[in-house]
């Protein structure tokens, strides 16, 4: 388908640095990327990140196994000891680092977004720029340094990604809250993730909305450098109702509903305080990424007063929300609803709210100075919970039943910190909760014997004789498996959700053809299962086996006998186990492997292909060989001939590469069909092929052409088939966490 007053947050950002690369940083001897000279050139960098060679523990390192061997109780005890061991270089508020650790964990997980699954706690990306230097993460570098002795003690058995989240849990528990549970298993990354965080070139700026004020693309935060929303209100305007709109939009794009939003904001602001002791100008130094080398990775050095403790400057807002900032309670809800709140400014100049009742002026103990007390405060985003009618109903319900509030926060916190981990099969540790939650995309446990090699041969024969074509079987298997995203480990063939709403209605899956194919595969499944009381096969397995069978037959037609590796063990989910709205976020706007592209795609067809390959965890050669194989197998989503550069569609050959690189063909734009190119015989002018930008990029991009040449060579036949098969199986097994 080719068709007014500067907000305090902004002031702090300017005071710290604009985060725009200074000219002097472009050293004379610094290599410039090709994109520097040719901005429109396709970047393949996303497919080259996080290689096994970047992991100092080595390619064979099994973190889940290491974590499983950990003494979790002892680790939690060590974290708890750290929470109350106040250090002079960063004194703890009220002698307790708990609120700081909660903020660290929250901001680590809170960059997750549902539209592309990127962000989240996995990988421990908060250690790296840009996240470690975002204005909203100011002074969280200290939280990680406080935890370093714990990380140092346990080494490879606890990742930073897990440690940050676990420390947030321990902090909550140490302050009297009962958490829902904790799952380990988040591996660490060793380099910054290449993520599109927005179009802006300066921190705390906003150029990411459409004319209606909605966020564009996959973005979730409302400004560059924020985790969610501006606490002072949209663009610093202290309007609670406008803030409510931003909150609902931003948190919604991070997979949270209204109840979860209220629970998280109220629960998070029950503990701790904001820091804005002084105006940042002239006080606060550069963020970690811009700090001098002797700072050793720490940033935001404050030269005013002691620079720490009572003189701390973080967000610029100042104060605590409750009278017990280190003890869990429902006081936040009471304060929010009981007081009439009036607008004021913090010592740093940030817009915030205090009670109009002077009797409230001494309710909150100072975090560092004995016998000094303050009024509680609220952000504009807090007042939004009171002013927005829907949020207010939830606040009143929680206030009337604090136990309901506690459970709602516990579950919302667990979801926040585990959303990007994928299904429960990836959870590790003694504190994994037993309750199965809908957002975990549950799949039933297998309670039957799996099919044997003999059964597989029998099923392959039935599939071959079913009347289904190679293209139909390949398209169906790909549609099922390629819904997986390695970004948040959602989707995939397991569960056979390709047979359920919403996936069976997606245009990219060609619903009419899909229904026909699945009906025949279900018939094969039913006949097999009827024969045996103990041995069963799932539809999910039959779908993947159908793709394998088709590829074997297509290779045989080219004179190559191969066996596509197949591992049974997938199960079938039900419609009741499938949240339609949630799964619709997996709906592809483009899938270059099937030559599918929509007008509301975030970027060009070639860029969307790279994005899709990245979400499948593919490298450049894997992406390349899969494109060649899918075109040879005639697997375009709509059965079109675009890019099917072969006279033998449905036969697994390297014809796509051979014909694409053939100098006897000259390409030109199709004047009557935007986005389509026509390949003519250079000598006669006869039309030979039609193709899309996704097809032609493998001859146009010098990097992709280099790989295409490998597969177009006369000696590439076996290599092409072997590499295609290996890459195909990789995609089919992306969600088979039981095999890893």
From Swiss-Prot:
Modifications the protein undergoes after translation, according to the UniProt entry: Formation of the three residue Trp-Tyr-Met cross-link is important for the catalase, but not the peroxidase activity of the enzyme.
Pfam families listed in its UniProt record: peroxidase
Annotated signal sequence range: 1-27
Record-annotated site: Transition state stabilizer: 103
Record GO biological process: cellular response to hydrogen peroxide; hydrogen peroxide catabolic process
Cofactor, how bound (note): Binds 1 heme b (iron(II)-protoporphyrin IX) group per dimer.
Catalytic reactions of this protein: H2O2 + AH2 = A + 2 H2O; 2 H2O2 = O2 + 2 H2O
Location in chain, cross-link Tryptophyl-tyrosyl-methioninium (Tyr-Met) (with W-106): 228-254
Cofactor(s) required for function per UniProt: heme b
Keyword Signal: yes
SUPFAM superfamilies assigned: Heme-dependent peroxidases (SSF48113)
Cross-link (Tryptophyl-tyrosyl-methioninium (Trp-Tyr) (with M-254)): 106-228
Binding site for heme b: 269
One GO cellular component term noted in the UniProt record for this chain: cytosol
Keywords per UniProt: Heme, Hydrogen peroxide, Iron, Metal-binding, Oxidoreductase, Peroxidase, Signal
EC number: 1.11.1.21
InterPro entries cross-referenced by the UniProt entry: Catalase_peroxidase (IPR000763), Haem_peroxidase (IPR002016), Haem_peroxidase_sf (IPR010255), Peroxidases_AS (IPR019794)
Full protein name: Catalase-peroxidase
Species of provenance: Colwellia psychrerythraea (strain 34H / ATCC BAA-681)
């Amino acid at each position: 388908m080719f068709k007014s007053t500067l907000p305090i947050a902004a002031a702090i950002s300017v005071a710290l640095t604009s985060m725009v690369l200074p000219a002097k940083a472009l050293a004379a001897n610094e290599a410039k990327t090709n994109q520097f000279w040719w901005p429109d050139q396709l970047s393949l960098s996303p497919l080259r990140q996080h290689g096994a060679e970047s992991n100092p523990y080595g390619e064979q390192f099994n973190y889940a196994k290491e974590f499983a061997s950990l003494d979790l109780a002892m680790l939690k005890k060590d974290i708890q000891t750290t929470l109350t061991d106040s250090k002079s270089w960063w004194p703890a508020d009220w002698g307790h680092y708990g609120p700081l650790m909660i903020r660290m964990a929250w901001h680590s997980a809170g960059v997750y977004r549902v539209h592309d699954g990127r962000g989240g706690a996995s990988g421990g990306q908060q250690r790296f720029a840009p996240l470690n230097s975002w204005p909203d993460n100011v002074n969280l570098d200290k939280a990680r340094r406080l935890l370093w002795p714990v990380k140092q003690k346990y080494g490879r058995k606890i990742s930073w990604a897990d440690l940050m989240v676990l420390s947030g849990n321990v902090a909550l528990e140490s302050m009297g809250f009962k958490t829902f549970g904790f799952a380990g298993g988040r591996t660490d990354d060793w380099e910054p993730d290449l993520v599109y965080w927005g179009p802006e070139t300066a921190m705390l700026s906003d150029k990411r909305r459409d004319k209606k004020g909605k966020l564009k693309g996959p973005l979730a935060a409302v400004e560059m450098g924020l985790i969610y929303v501006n606490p002072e209100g949209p663009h610093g305007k202290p309007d609670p109702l406008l803030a409510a709109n931003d909150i609902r939009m931003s948190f919604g794009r991070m997979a949270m509903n209204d109840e979860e939003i209220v629970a998280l904001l109220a629960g998070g602001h029950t503990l701790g305080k904001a820091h804005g002791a002084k105006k940042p100008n002239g006080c606060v130094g550069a963020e970690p990424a811009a700090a001098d080398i002797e700072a050793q990775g720490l940033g935001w050095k404050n030269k005013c007063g002691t620079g720490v403790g009572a003189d701390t400057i973080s967000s610029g807002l100042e104060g605590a929300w409750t009278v017990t900032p280190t003890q869990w309670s429902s006081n936040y809800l009471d304060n929010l609803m009981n007081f009439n709140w009036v607008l004021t400014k913090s010592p740093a100049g940030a817009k915030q709210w205090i009670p109009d009742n002077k009797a409230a002026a001494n309710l909150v103990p100072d975090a560092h100075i004995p016998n000094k007390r303050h009024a509680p405060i609220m952000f504009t985003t807090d007042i939004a919970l009171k002013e927005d009618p829907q949020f207010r109903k939830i606040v009143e319900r929680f206030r009337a039943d604090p136990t309901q509030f506690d459970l709602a926060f516990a579950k919302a916190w667990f979801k926040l910190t585990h959303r990007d981990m994928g299904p429960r099969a990836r959870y590790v540790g003694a504190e994994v909760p037993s309750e199965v939650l809908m957002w975990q995309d549950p799949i039933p446990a297998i309670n039957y014997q799996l099919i044997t090699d003999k059964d597989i041969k029998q099923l392959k024969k039935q599939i071959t004789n079913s009347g289904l074509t190679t293209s139909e079987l390949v398209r169906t298997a790909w549609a099922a498996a390629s819904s997986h995203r390695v970004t948040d480990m959602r989707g995939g063939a397991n569960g056979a959700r390709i047979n359920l709403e919403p996936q069976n209605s997606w245009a990219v899956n060609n619903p009419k053809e899909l229904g026909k194919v699945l009906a025949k595969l279900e018939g094969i499944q039913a006949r097999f299962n009827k024969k045996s009381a103990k041995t069963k096969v799932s539809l999910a397995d039959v779908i993947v086996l159908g793709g394998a069978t088709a590829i074997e037959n297509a290779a045989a037609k080219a004179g190559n006998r191969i066996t596509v590796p197949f591992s049974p063990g997938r199960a079938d989910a039900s419609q009741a186990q499938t949240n339609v709205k949630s799964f619709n976020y997996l709906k592809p706007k483009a899938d270059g492997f099937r030559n599918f592209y929509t007008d509301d795609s975030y970027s060009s067809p070639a860029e969307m292909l790279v994005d899709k390959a990245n979400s499948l965890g593919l490298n450049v050669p894997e992406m390349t060989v899969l494109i060649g194989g899918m075109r040879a197998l005639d697997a375009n989503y709509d059965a079109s001939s675009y890019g099917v550069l072969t006279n033998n569609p449905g036969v697994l050959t390297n014809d796509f590469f051979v014909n694409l690189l053939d100098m006897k063909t000259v390409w030109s734009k199709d004047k009557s069909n935007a986005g389509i190119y026509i390949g003519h015989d250079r000598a006669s002018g006869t039309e030979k092929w039609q193709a899309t930008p996704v097809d032609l990029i493998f001859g146009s991009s010098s990097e992709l052409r280099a790989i295409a040449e490998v597969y177009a060579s006369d000696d590439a036949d076996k290599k092409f088939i072997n590499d295609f098969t290996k890459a195909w199986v990789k995609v089919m097994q992306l969600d088979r966490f039981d095999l890893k």
